[in-house]
Amino acid sequence: MSSPVDSIRDKLIDALKVSDERHREQRADRIIWMSTYRSRPGVIVGRPETLAMLDEAEDAFREGHFISVQLLALAFVEHTIVEELVGRSLSKERVNFERAIELAQSNQVLDTKLLSRIDRLREIRNPFAHRRPHDDPDTYGNRYISRQIHPRAMLEQDAREAFQVMYLVFSALLKAA
């Protein structure tokens, strides 16, 4: 005789099968898209937290968790830039992201256009990470209303941009072991 938990579990598995089938093609398309940006050497050495964010951002993108992609990709970028600044004795360990971008700019750590993209993504990410006033033009609601775009489409565009930038930073600051 099955328990109530087993019955619920069976129903959940059936529902998940339907959901998996419904989203499979979109996941496949996202995996193909990611493969054009994702390039890694055989072995990567780095801080476990930083590398875990890289992996988690990929998982989140594949599954369509676009806000998570933005948060994880930008956290990865922040960690990587700060680590580079510290390694070059240009900064202390604790520097905020905006200041790290400024230091990277003034010390030519990364390409100016890439740093501009990073800073814009930081502005887009901030309302998810830090409470903002209702009239802040970078809040999620204000952005999709002003752009006259479906919220989910905008989130996916932002996630794609964050993912691209994450891998551009990864490639630019990758060091040979």
Cite the ranges covered by each PLM segment:
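Short, structured secondary-structure boundary patches
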Residues: 16, 31-35, 89-94, 134-136
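Charge-enriched, short contiguous segments at helix-coil
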Residues: 112-177
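Charged alpha-helical initiation segments
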Residues: 1-65
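Amphipathic alpha-helical interface segments
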Residues: 37-91, 159-168, 172-177
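A short, mixed-charge helix-start or loop-turn motif at secondary-structure junctions
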Residues: 38-40, 107, 148
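Surface-exposed polar/charged interaction patches
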Residues: 18-22, 107, 172, 176
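Flexible secondary-structure boundary motifs
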Residues: 71, 75-115, 135
